[in-house]
């Protein structure tokens, strides 16, 4: 994911990372929360391909014109463990794969389902994957947009619009000894054009976990559930080269943030459901098979 179309290390974006449950590798998160910004594109992959993804991000950043003197890159890479369907120990993701993904990124509609980092993921016992959703506030509430992208790979009792669909389908975690695996993780990225600083982006990120809960996820012992939130507001970008003088920023007042919180909750919930609706049955490593959510049923 590209925070904007320019060089992110030269124009960093305000950001925050929230850990709903920390059993996952999210590189760069401590610096993001220390400095309050993100300085690279965001890459999602599988657990054992994190080093390759980091190398790809670093190579991409160093190769950009104007970055000849850059000697530190805080690469942001998130992951989930897709070892049931993917030959994860083979570490097939390469640095070139990451570079190709970055170079081919477009502002077009997100391809959802069993694609990219979602190719091998499993969600609520069904095929998971990449999902997205968005909300736009009315002009009376600022007219801001919230966009959410998820990599769904976790368990619980699938719930859609408040209905326990997993229970109805008799397929949910702990229903029998074969369906007791709720581990795997969920990566959630929340982007907004609202002028939020690190503190309010952290508050926004926390609300995304409520959206995960609304789908029936439980943030289990072995599930790493992280939220990366950032603002695209151009006037609040952090320039790499500064004159060390104070810079005026636009910050949305606390009292105006609640509509954004609701939007983040709704969009996260919907993005997770969309990842399931778009995914198709997948046969993977060693013939392991995961069925898609039976939509007609």
Kindly give the residue locations of the regions a language model identified.
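Alpha/propeptide regions of enzymes that mature by internal proteolysis
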Residues: 1-297
């Amino acid at each position: 994911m590209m925070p904007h179309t320019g060089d992110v290390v030269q124009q960093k974006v305000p950001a925050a990372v929230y850990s709903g449950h920390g059993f996952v590798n999210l590189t760069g998160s401590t610096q993001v929360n220390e400095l309050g910004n993100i300085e690279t594109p965001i890459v999602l992959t599988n657990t054992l391909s994190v080093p390759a993804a980091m190398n790809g991000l670093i190579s991409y950043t160093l190769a950009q014109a104007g970055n000849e003197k850059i000697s530190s890159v805080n690469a942001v890479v998130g992951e989930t463990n897709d070892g049931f369907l993917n030959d994860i120990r083979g570490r097939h993701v390469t640095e070139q794969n990451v570079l190709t993904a970055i170079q081919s990124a477009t502002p077009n509609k997100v391809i959802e389902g069993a694609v990219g980092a979602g190719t091998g993921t499993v969600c609520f016992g069904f095929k998971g994957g990449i999902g997205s959703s968005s909300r736009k506030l009315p002009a009376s509430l600022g007219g801001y947009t919230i966009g959410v992208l998820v990599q769904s790979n976790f368990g619980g009792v699938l719930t859609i619009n408040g209905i326990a669909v997993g229970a109805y389908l008799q397929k949910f975690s702990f229903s029998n000894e074969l369906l007791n695996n709720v581990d795997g993780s969920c990566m959630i990225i929340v982007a907004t054009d609202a002028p939020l600083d690190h503190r309010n982006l952290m508050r926004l990120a926390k609300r995304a976990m409520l959206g995960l809960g609304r789908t029936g996820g439980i943030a289990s012992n072995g599930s790493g559930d992280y939220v990366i939130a950032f603002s695209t507001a151009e006037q609040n970008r952090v320039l790499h080269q500064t004159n060390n003088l104070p810079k005026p920023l636009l910050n949305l007042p606390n009292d105006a943030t609640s509509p954004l919180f609701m939007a983040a909750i709704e969009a996260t919930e919907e993005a997770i459901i969309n990842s399931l609706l778009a995914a198709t049955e997948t046969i993977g490593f060693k013939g392991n098979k995961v069925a898609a959510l039976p939509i007609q049923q």
